[in-house]
Design a protein with these regions (language model features):
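Bergerat-fold GHKL ATPase/HATPase_c domain
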Residues: 1-53, 87-94, 224-225, 229-235
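ATP-lid-like helix-loop hinge signature
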Residues: 40-76
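GHKL-type ATPase core
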Residues: 73-74, 99-235, 332-340, 350, ...
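Acidic ATP/Mg2+-coordinating residue in the GHKL
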Residues: 79
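A short glycine-centered beta->alpha linker in the GHKL/HATPase_c
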Residues: 83-85
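Charged regulatory segments coupled to nucleotide-binding catalytic modules in large multidomain enzymes
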Residues: 151-155, 178-200, 209-251, 362, ...
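Helix-hairpin-helix
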Residues: 252-272, 277, 312, 362-381
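Conserved tyrosine-mediated DNA breakage-rejoining catalytic core shared by Y-recombinases
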Residues: 313-346
Length: 612
C-alpha cells in the first residue's frame, strides 16, 4: 500500500448513487417499475399500521408525449393514510437508510432505501426536485419541494409551505427517466397482483396513455396489525449481543446544576439546604419512587459523604467494583481521590448493577422473547454460566461463547408470531375468486414456523379451470404482500413447484392452473436489495412443500371426481346413441309393435360436477 494513497469516507446515499443497481435501479425500464413499487408499498404500509382501509391513486405522465422512450415521466402517488409529521418529512424522503421499518415486525419495506432511492434516481436523471404533500390531521397540509444532497446524505429544502385541506394523507411526486413502453406490462401486472394480495385496498392507476385501471376492495376487514417484538435467541449474533449489552449499561450521570435540580425535585427538597445525613434520610424514605439516574447520584453521595455543593465540584473517574474502590477528581483540590466502598452497603448494589449490568438470567428474560426465569436458568446450566453472572463483566471470548450457546440451545420456545400479519384464508380466497373465477379453488394457511429465529407464515392458494386463460402452471409469488415479478427462476417458490410431480395429482399437459404463494415474515430472506426473489432457506422450503402438498391433494380429489363425472357423461352419451337402436332391433326381432320404455335409462338426473 502506497504511503501517498488517500482514504475517504462516503455517505450511504453516495454509495447507492454509485451502486444503484443493487436497489433495482439498473436501467430506465427497471427503475420506473421499482419506483412505482416503492411508493405504493410505502402507502399501503402506512395505512396498514394505522388500520386504515387503503385508497391509493397512482399516475404516470410523460413530460413530452411525442418523444420516444426512454424519456422523462412524472410519477405521482397519493394515499389516504396517516401522513408523516412535518418535522420528519425532509429526513424520511431526503436521507438514505432513514425510516420506521427497522423493528422486528412484518412490513413490506425493510431496508429504509426504496422511496429515497427512487428520489435519488429521479434527481440524477432529471435534476428535478421532489414534491411531498403531507397532512396528519386532515386540516393542515405541509408541502415540501426538495432535493437530496448526495455527498452529505441530507435533504435540501427548496420550499416549504402550508395550506388548509379536507383530509389526511400523503402525496409524493417525482420526475424520473423511464421506459414505459417496456415497463408498462410489469407495472400493470404489479398493480393487478397487489390488488389480488390486498383485497381490502382500492388501487387506481392512470397510465401515460390515458387508460385507467381500478381495483376496488372486495373485503372490508383488515388483517390484524403486527406488533414489534424482542429478538429470538436463535436469531442473534455477537454484534447483536454487544449492542444489547450497551443498552444494559447505565451511564454515570453528570452531577451538574440540572441534575441537582432533578435530585432536589424527586426528593422534595425544593431549595432547602439540608445536611448530608438529612439528605440521605430523605433518600431512604423515597428510594422506590426515585428514577435510576437519581438513585445513582444518591449512591455516589453515600460513599463520598458530600452534600450537593461539594458533589457538584467533582467528576467520577472510576467505579472499581472488583477492588471496591470509588475514584473521583476533586476540582477544588485539583487531585484524584479514591475512597473505599462497603459491599454490605444498601447503595453498593445500585452502583454494582450500574457498572456490571444485569445478571445473565435477568438479561435473558428482559431482552429476548418467550424466555422466562425457568428457561433462563436451564440455559445458564447448558451454557455453563453462573445465573448471577453479570453481563457487563463478560470478556469477548465469553460473549462468543454466550452467542453460540443461544443459537444451539433447543429448549427455547418457538418465535412469537404476533409480529406477523398474514392475509388470512378467507380474504385470499375472495381475492383469487374475483380475479380467476375458477372451477376449483382451495387455500391454506400454515402454522407459524421460524428460520434463524425469525418467525414466518406460509399462505398458499390453488385455482384450476374456469376462466383461467393461461395454459400451463402460472405462479404468483408474494412476500409480505409484495408481488415478486422479476428473477423468478431463482426463487424458492418456483423451485418447490418445479420439483413437484404433478402427474401424481392427475394434472397433466398444460393445465389451466394458478398457484398463489405468500410468505410473511419479520425478515424475508431476499437474495438482493431489490426484493425480487426469496432464498431457499430449508425451513421455508419445507413449509412451502407442505402447503403445496395439502392443496395438491385437494386438487387431486377434485380431478378424480371430475374424471368420474366426465366418464359418466361419456357413458350416458354412448347409451343415448345405441340404446334406441338396440330397442328398435329387439322390437322387430320379437315381432312386437311397441318398443320397450328405454328412455328412462338415459334421462336420469344430470350429473353435477362437485366443486370444492
Amino acid at each position: 500500500m502506497s504511503s501517498e494513497e488517500s482514504f475517504t469516507q462516503i455517505s450511504p446515499s453516495e454509495f447507492f448513487y454509485r451502486n444503484r443497481d443493487l436497489a433495482g435501479f439498473s436501467n430506465p425500464t427497471r427503475s420506473l417499475y421499482t419506483a412505482v413499487r416503492e411508493f405504493i408499498e410505502n402507502s399501503l404500509d402506512a395505512c396498514d399500521q394505522k388500520g386504515i382501509l387503503p385508497d391509493v391513486h397512482m399516475s404516470i405522465k410523460a413530460v413530452d408525449a411525442e418523444k420516444p422512450d426512454p424519456k422523462q415521466y412524472i410519477l405521482s402517488v397519493r394515499d389516504n393514510g396517516p401522513g408523516i409529521e412535518s418535522s420528519h418529512v425532509p429526513l424520511a424522503f431526503g436521507t438514505v437508510l432513514y425510516g420506521s421499518k427497522f423493528g422486528l415486525k412484518q412490513a413490506r419495506g425493510m431496508f429504509g432505501l426504496g422511496a429515497t432511492m427512487a428520489i435519488l434516481y429521479g434527481q440524477i436523471t432529471t435534476n428535478k426536485p421532489l414534491i411531498v404533500k403531507s397532512s396528519t390531521d386532515g386540516k393542515i397540509q405541509d408541502e415540501y419541494e426538495m432535493l437530496l444532497d448526495i455527498q452529505k446524505n441530507k435533504p435540501v429544502i427548496l420550499k416549504h409551505e402550508t395550506k388548509e385541506v379536507a383530509k389526511a394523507g400523503l402525496s409524493v411526486s417525482i420526475r424520473l427517466e423511464g421506459d414505459y413502453s417496456k415497463a408498462g406490462s410489469k407495472i400493470r401486472d404489479y398493480v393487478y397482483q397487489t390488488s389480488l394480495i390486498t383485497p381490502y385496498a382500492t388501487i387506481t392507476f392512470d397510465d401515460p396513455k390515458g387508460d385507467r385501471y381500478r381495483y376496488t376492495k372486495v373485503v372490508r376487514t383488515m388483517p390484524p396489525s403486527p406488533t414489534i417484538i424482542r429478538p429470538h435467541p436463535h436469531g442473534i449474533d455477537v454484534e447483536t449481543i454487544r449492542r444489547m449489552l450497551l443498552d444494559t449499561h447505565y451511564q454515570i450521570p453528570a452531577v451538574d446544576d440540572n441534575m441537582i435540580l432533578k435530585v432536589r425535585k424527586e426528593l422534595g427538597l425544593a431549595n432547602k439546604n439540608l445536611s448530608y445525613s438529612e439528605i440521605m434520610d430523605k433518600t431512604q424514605k423515597k428510594w422506590k419512587a426515585l428514577t435510576r439516574p437519581v438513585r445513582t447520584v444518591m449512591a455516589l453521595m453515600s460513599f463520598l459523604k458530600m452534600d450537593f455543593e461539594k458533589l457538584s465540584k467533582t467528576t467520577i473517574e472510576e467505579i472499581d467494583i472488583g477492588n471496591k474502590k470509588l475514584t473521583y477528581w476533586d476540582f477544588g483540590e485539583s487531585q484524584s481521590v479514591s475512597v473505599d466502598m462497603d459491599p454490605e452497603s444498601f447503595y453498593y448494589k445500585q452502583l454494582a448493577s450500574t457498572v456490571q449490568g444485569e445478571t445473565l438470567t435477568s438479561f435473558l428474560s428482559k431482552r429476548f422473547q418467550r424466555v422466562g426465569p425457568t428457561t433462563a436458568l436451564k440455559f445458564a446450566e447448558f451454557a455453563k454460566f453462573k445465573p448471577e453472572h453479570r453481563i457487563g463483566t463478560m470478556t469477548n471470548q465469553e460473549l462468543v461463547k454466550l452467542t453460540d450457546a443461544l443459537q444451539s440451545f433447543d429448549d427455547f420456545m418457538a418465535p412469537d408470531p404476533s409480529c406477523l400479519a398474514p392475509l388470512g384464508e378467507s380474504p385470499l380466497e375472495k381475492g383469487m375468486q374475483r380475479f380467476f373465477e375458477p372451477d376449483f379453488l382451495a387455500v391454506v394457511q400454515r402454522g407459524a414456523s421460524a428460520y434463524s429465529g425469525f418467525p414466518f407464515i406460509i399462505e398458499m392458494g390453488i385455482a384450476y379451470g374456469g376462466k383461467i386463460a393461461s395454459r400451463g402452471i402460472k405462479v404468483y409469488r408474494f412476500a409480505n404482500r409484495i408481488p415478486l415479478l422479476y428473477d423468478e427462476g431463482s426463487d424458492v417458490v418456483l423451485k418447490v413447484v418445479n420439483d413437484t410431480d404433478w402427474s401424481r395429482y392427475k394434472v397433466k399437459g398444460e393445465p389451466p392452473l394458478v398457484i398463489v404463494s405468500h410468505i410473511c415474515s419479520t425478515r424475508i430472506p431476499y437474495k438482493t436489495v431489490g426484493k425480487e426473489n426469496v432464498a431457499d432457506r430449508p425451513e421455508i422450503e419445507r413449509e412451502l412443500k407442505l402447503a403445496l402438498l395439502s392443496l395438491s391433494r385437494k386438487l387431486s380429489s377434485f380431478m378424480s371426481k371430475r374424471g368420474q363425472a366426465e366418464a359418466a357423461i361419456k357413458r350416458k352419451n354412448l347409451y343415448s346413441k345405441y340404446i334406441p337402436l338396440i330397442a328398435q332391433f329387439c322390437t322387430e326381432l320379437a315381432g312386437k309393435k311397441k318398443e320397450p320404455n328405454y328412455k328412462k335409462m338415459i334421462t336420469e338426473e344430470p350429473i353435477v360436477e362437485e366443486k370444492t
